[in-house]
């Protein structure tokens, strides 16, 4: 049953459907929001709100990295520099926000020393399934291309 849910998530092509699928209680959802996001896209705001970042959206558009589950924030870097390790055997995760070589802030979602990033400008999402103990999906929302979903 869980494998069917994972496959349905991977085949979802719009933010509304993906938002619904991410409510699976067996999912940890890692969300990286780059500084390039300005919050003008209403669909993106709804997506992030459903993912658990609604309170953060009230204080202007957030930048940082979050770990959420069922629309609740479990951990977050905040907008400043941070590095947080999260262990869920057999995996080890790191969410971090740091200054890059060009002085701009960069976000990273790392699992077992592999960095996951689909788009350079926008939102990156990594979905970990607690039952299968695998990364089940990863995608980006490219704000430089009309919030197109990139898998």
Give the residues covered by each predicted segment.
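Short acidic-hydrophobic catalytic motif
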Residues: 1-151
């Amino acid at each position: 049953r869980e494998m069917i849910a994972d496959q349905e998530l991977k085949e979802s092509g719009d933010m509304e459907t993906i938002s619904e699928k991410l409510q699976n209680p067996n999912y940890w959802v890692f969300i990286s929001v780059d500084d390039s996001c300005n919050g003008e896209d209403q669909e993106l705001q709804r997506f992030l709100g459903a993912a658990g970042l609604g309170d953060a959206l009230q204080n202007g558009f957030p930048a940082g990295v979050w770990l959420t589950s069922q629309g609740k924030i479990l951990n977050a870097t905040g907008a400043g520099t941070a590095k947080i390790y999260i262990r869920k055997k057999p995996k080890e995760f790191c969410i971090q926000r740091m200054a890059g070589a060009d002085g701009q802030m960069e976000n990273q979602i790392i699992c077992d020393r592999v960095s996951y990033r689909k788009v350079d400008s926008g939102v990156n999402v990594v979905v970990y399934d607690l039952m299968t103990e695998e990364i089940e999906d990863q995608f980006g929302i490219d704000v430089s291309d009309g919030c197109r979903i990139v898998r």
